[in-house]
Amino acid sequence: VDGVRRTWESTWSNPRDVLLLFDIDGTLLLKASREHAEALHAALRRIHLLEEIPTGKIEAAGRTDDAIARSILTLAGVPAERVDDRARDVRAMACAEYQHRCPADLRAHLAPGVPEVLDVLAARPDVDLALLTGNLDCIARLKVDRAGIGHHFPRGEGAFGSDSEDRTDLPEIARTRHGTARGEPPYPRERTVVIGDTPRDIACARADGCHVIAIATGPFRPSDLAGADVVVDMAREIPAALARIPGLA
């Protein structure tokens, strides 16, 4: 089956192009998650009538919003069936809460070099950009729009935490949407590069057979990101990193 799928994907009309899938928090934006966390916690309190949010043992880096919510609710003693039944309500409430809480201007939270490197990459005819993030889609779009970089990421493309609780599902979703938007099959995984700052970004790329560039601007050290094709320190190094991945040059 996988061989058939790879052959189908290889029929893309421009097989030398590259699809870059960008994470947001810790990659494009730094320290821009406080209001996001507050919105999710407020939604969990309101939907599940929680008095307190037990967050002390929850690791959020690289996880989807649904996965973070499930961990919090499990610690709070909410039955799994109820977590599933009210997940859609939590998403909707979190989006509404974030609309009220999101700062009007997030440009000060852009990681160094991000606006410039996105301009450079977007100007290349062989490169397409999209988002791949654990954020709910409504939250992700508001973040990049208010950071002044939303125009680089086409609406209706990419993949988000609202698409699947499991981050490893997201690259295939993003590749499929990219192809569908152009009347093509799913974009070839061997021409797709996930760009993120956590081991979970690396794991989701590898699960789908994609390349991955890790950027050490988040909470993890370069040694923690050694499973990537290339590890860089700054966003401005991404174009050079692409040239170092075999088969993409």
Labelled PLM ranges:
Residues K57-A61, T133, S162-D163:
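Active-site nucleophile and cofactor-binding loops and adjacent substrate-binding regions
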Residues A39-I47, V90-R101, V120:
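Generic non-transmembrane alpha-helical segments
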Residues D23, A130-L132, I195, I215:
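Short hydrophobic segments within beta-strands
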Residues S71, A76-Q99:
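Active-site phosphate-binding/coordination module
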Residues G3-A61, A67-T74:
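Active-site neighborhood of HAD-like aspartate-dependent phosphohydrolases
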Residues V1-V18, E81-V83, R107, P115, ...:
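Asp-based, Mg2+/Mn2+-dependent phosphohydrolase catalytic module
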Residues A37-H41, D65-D66, R70, R91-C95, ...:
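An amphipathic alpha-helix signature
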Residues W8, L21, Q99-L131:
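Short, acidic loop-to-helix structural element flanking the phosphoryl-transfer center
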